[in-house]
Every structure is written in C-alpha cells, then in structure tokens.
C-alpha cells in the first residue's frame, strides 16, 4: 500500500542543448507536492545538480552519471520510492515502464510525439487537445492539458494583481530573459539590438552563470548604466512585475510572463517551443519570432520598435496573455497526481532507503 506520505522521484533532463526549463518546472511541481504531504527527490546529473544548487538546494538527490535510461536505472538501484515524474523527451513508454516498475507515474510533455506509460500526463500547451494523446497513452490516463496546469512558482500568482494594475503606462524598463543556458548566445545578440533603441529606458538581462553571452555582457554592463545583469536570479517575479515589456524565450517561462500580463516578443529557440508559441500568436498574446527565420535581426528590430512605440499593442498583449494563465497550475497538478497515487496499490518496492 502507498504510505501516508508518498516518496516521489523526479527524472528531469537538463544541459546546454535542452536548457534548464524541465528542471525548473519540476522544482515547482515538487514543492507543490511537498506542501501537500509528499517527499520528493531528483535523479541528478551535474547539469541537474547545478540548477538544484541555486533554485532547489533543499531537494534531496540520487546521483546519476547521465540521464540515459541505463544510467537512470543504475541510479535507482536500491532506492525506495512510491511514484515517479518524468520530464525528459528522450524517454518513452518502454523506458517509463522499466524505470517506474508499476508505480504511479506522471509524465510532463510538450510534444505528443511518442508513446507514454503514464497514469497522468501534464501538457500545458494552450493548443493541446485530448485527441493528441489518444494513440499515445492508455485509456485510463488522466490528461492535464492547457496553461491552467502550467507549473508556475507561487510568487507569480501572489504578484498578479499588482502587476496587472500597473500595465499600460510608458515604457521605462525592458526585460530580456532568453533562458538560463542562453542557447547559441542569443541573449547577447538581442541585447545588442535593444541597446541601439533604448534611449533612457533601463534594461534588465537575466541569464545563467554558464551562459555563453555572459562574459561579453559583463563588459557592456560595466560601461552602460542603463543595463543590469541578473545571474541565476531568484527575483524573476519581481523583475517581470517591474518591466514594461520583455523579449523572452518560448519555453515554460512564457507562463510566468502570462500570469503577470507582461507584453512580450517571444523567440522560438527549439522545436518543442513551436506549438505553444503558435497558440499564443493565434490568440494575439505575444509577438513570435523563430530564431531560424531569415533576417532575424530585422525581425527582432521590428518587434522592439512595435513594443516601444505602440501602447495599444502592449495593452492588447497584456490582456490576452493574462487571460491564458493564472499561475495556480502547480497546485492543481500536484493534487491530481496525489489523488491518482492514493487511489492505486503500488507494487512491492525493492529494499532500500527512501530518497
């Protein structure tokens, strides 16, 4: 039987190519589960550990040499757990079954492109339909679809009222947040486009300690008083609150900006971001730019000019984005998964310490 306080193990991918968004949203979900009576731990490679050190230092870990299926299995040898959460595009049904061994399983996904073995699937894409998973999951799989289930840290919903009440004024501050890993050095490229057009506007730039753009941006910030760097910041909610528009990535951070109604141009940096970006564009909730498009600099320039000069556009983007996500999704997802865990008998666990 499942104990009163279930142990839940997270497998979330991270690295220079995939970024840190998988781990970040899993940290948020893990904390929501912890607040509701679960004990959570992460299977941890060095890339995952680097994020946990900064953003989830209290979370226990099970070390793994890599997040390849065999190495995950080795890391789980002797570990006692009651349920698993997978946020890893490289794992599909066979891997989920082999690793979870009959335990309750939640899979966080954005692609709907492979078979999944899951009691619960969480896909926060705004255009996602149940039919997208009809051939990929079991009939009994519970689907948590749409931004209402997006795992967003609670500080964003706490600031929602204050943020929405200050939208609509002049542009005084701009935020650049293109992912902690700064894929391809895109942050430096965008900052250079912005600096040519800021005049008296301030610029807050968020990125990780290992971002390839960081050394160059440190030099620029030292001689440009308009610009402030925020490295591995814990204050993203406050930065979004105080900004008047953003140039951001089209990953899971889009929900943070939606909760606080921040007008944004979003850059599609990876194929898994295309669906959510297209859905936001269709709802006129963001300006969307694909980094693989021709004339990228010109497209960025046009978006900057529109956001700087068109107050009506900013107001429309703010209202449309705020209507998409309220920031309470982590709690909804945690409660749904705990209900599933409580309703199922677990297979006997291998002997070993709980994570």
Where are these regions (language model features)?
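Donor-nucleotide binding loops and adjacent catalytic segments primarily
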Residues: 161-162, 166-244
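A short acidic/histidine/glycine-rich donor-binding loop in glycosyltransferase catalytic cores
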Residues: 264, 282-294, 306
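Active-site and donor-binding regions of nucleotide-sugar-utilizing enzymes
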Residues: 10-20, 25-32, 44-137
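C-terminal "capping" alpha-helix adjacent to the active site of nucleotide-linked donor transferases
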Residues: 295-312
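A donor-sugar binding/catalytic signature common to diverse glycosyltransferases
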Residues: 20, 234-276
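C-terminal alpha-helical cap of glycosyltransferases
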Residues: 327-355
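A short, well-ordered alpha-helix in the C-terminal region of glycosyltransferases
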Residues: 306, 313-327
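A nucleotide-sugar donor-handling region in carbohydrate enzymes
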Residues: 117-185, 210, 214
């Amino acid at each position: 039987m499942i104990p009163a306080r279930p142990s839940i193990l997270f497998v979330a991918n991270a690295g220079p190519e995939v970024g840190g968004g998988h781990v970040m949203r899993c940290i948020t979900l893990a904390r929501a589960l912890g607040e509701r009576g679960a004990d959570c731990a992460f299977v941890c490679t060095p890339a995952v550990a680097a994020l946990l050190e900064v953003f989830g230092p209290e979370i226990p870990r099970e070390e793994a040499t890599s997040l390849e299926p065999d190495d995950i299995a080795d890391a789980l040898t002797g570990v006692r757990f009651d349920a698993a959460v997978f946020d890893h595009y490289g794992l599909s049904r066979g891997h989920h079954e082999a690793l979870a061994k009959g335990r309750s399983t939640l899979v966080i996904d954005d692609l709907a492109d492979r078979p999944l073995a899951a009691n619960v699937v969480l896909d926060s894409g705004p255009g996602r339909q149940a039919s997208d998973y009809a051939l990929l999951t079991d009939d009994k799989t519970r689907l948590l679809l749409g931004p209402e289930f997006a795992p967003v840290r609670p500080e964003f919903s706490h600031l929602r009222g204050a943020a929405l009440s200050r939208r609509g004024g002049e542009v005084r501050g701009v935020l650049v947040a293109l992912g902690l890993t700064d894929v391809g050095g895109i942050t430096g490229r965008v900052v250079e486009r912005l600096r040519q057009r800021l005049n008296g506007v301030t610029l807050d730039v968020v990125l990780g300690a290992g971002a390839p753009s960081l050394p160059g941006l440190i030099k620029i910030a030292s001689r440009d008083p308009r610009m402030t760097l925020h490295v591995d910041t814990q204050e993203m909610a406050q930065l979004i609150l105080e900004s008047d528009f953003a140039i951001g990535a089209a990953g899971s951070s889009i929900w943070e900006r939606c909760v606080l109604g921040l007008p944004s141009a979003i850059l599609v940096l990876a194929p898994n971001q295309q669906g959510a970006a297209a859905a936001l564009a269709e709802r006129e909730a963001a300006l969307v730019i694909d980094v693989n498009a021709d004339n990228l600099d010109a497209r960025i320039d046009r978006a900057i000019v529109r956001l700087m000069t068109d107050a009506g556009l900013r107001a429309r983007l703010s209202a449309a984005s705020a209507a998409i996500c309220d920031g309470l999704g982590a709690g909804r997802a945690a409660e749904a998964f705990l209900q599933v865990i409580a309703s199922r008998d677990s297979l006997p666990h291998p002997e070993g310490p709980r994570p």
